[in-house]
Amino acid sequence: MRIAVMAFCLLAGPLSGPLTAQAVPCGGRFADFVDGLRAEALAQGQPADVVEAFFRTVRQDDAVLRADRQQGIFQRDFIDFSRRLISQDRLDRARDRAERLDATFDRIEQLYGVQRGVLLAFWAFETDFGTFQGDFNTANALVTLAHDCRRPGLFRPEVFAAMTLFARGDFDPARTTGAWAGEIGQVQMLPADILDAGVDGDGDGHVNLQDSAEDALTSGANLLHRLGWQAGQPWLQEIVVPAGLDWALTGLDKTRPVAEWAALGVTARDGALGNDGLAASVLLPMGRSGPAFLAYPNFRIYFEWNQSLTYVTTAAYFANRITGAPVYAAGDPDPGLNGDQMRRLQQRLAALGHDVGQIDGILGARTRAAVQTEQARLGLPADAWPTRRLLDAL
């Protein structure tokens, strides 16, 4: 779930804040690092028996580091990715679970204002409705990633959050398993998020996101609510854009009221646009000739769950499909660039002075922004979709 994706996209960097006197820097001998974590936990006030029991079975997991560095799924474009993740079978199962858990979803919508389709989509994508929640030992994963010097400031606090869950009986360092980045349960939440937003949805006295769908869904809704989800508001809507639209106006970094988009010729493909005064952005995940959406403020909350534009667009679209929206119009988009071509484009953009982040062949927000700027400079349609034509022009 949310910080999970930071594991995919944050760059290596210094810790976000000063370490305590007991903290040990990342790297070095793993055993020495764990000793430092023990000392820090004791300094934080954790009982000695809890600290000893938590770290007793912790081991470094090289498979976690390999998984952290191999995330090719995020190189897929929206059409490819969405067709891989969304099938009629998955859609049918989502609707079946919506019916079976109708009372739970009614309660969630009343308490937190998060629509059932949103949660069902995350539940489907994260663990296939709880079927596969990951088989990495969570304590090992978190300590391994905290020891790794790419993002220690992200994962170190999660170690202590997991320890707190252990102390209250909601985590087992020897048996709790999940994703490689430390997420737990049917909607894949990190320990700190469980501490902050975990809810006992089934009333058994524990927050058990692995075995209780009610706990998992209610906790996920509470987290989205705390992140700013607006009850009763849309998140993503398929639209039809006029051929003469100024493509430089598109992109998530540019918003204007729905009424202004309507005045520019933007229409809903199904139903009506959102309220006239609602801020929105035109999202073209594969350029002006591909699918088109209007992204509302709630869509931005998705990026707190996962920072891949392809993933969140697919999840938001699937949420709409679950509740009756039609299949999107794929259009006829330019095929774009392969990984090697994307890396060449990023290198060229960087040479021109653009900050594209890591040269990794992945189309991220900074690369899209640089592409749109160069398209406008060269007199090309500035839809932020990188093409061979742009690469050749550069």
Question: What is each residue range found by the language model?
Answer:
Residues 46-277, 290-293, 301-319, 326-339, ...:
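Catalytic glycan-binding domains that act on GlcNAc-containing polysaccharides
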Residues 33-40, 104, 141, 345-348, ...:
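A general alpha-helix detector
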Residues 25-27:
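Sequence contexts marking disulfide-bonded cysteines in secreted/extracellular proteins
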Residues 17-23:
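Sec/Tat signal peptide C-region and signal peptidase I cleavage site
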Residues 29-48, 52:
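Mature N-terminal segment immediately following signal peptide/propeptide cleavage
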Residues 335-342, 350-394:
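Short acidic, glycine/serine/threonine-rich helix-capping segments at coil-helix boundaries
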Residues 4-17:
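Bacterial N-terminal signal peptides
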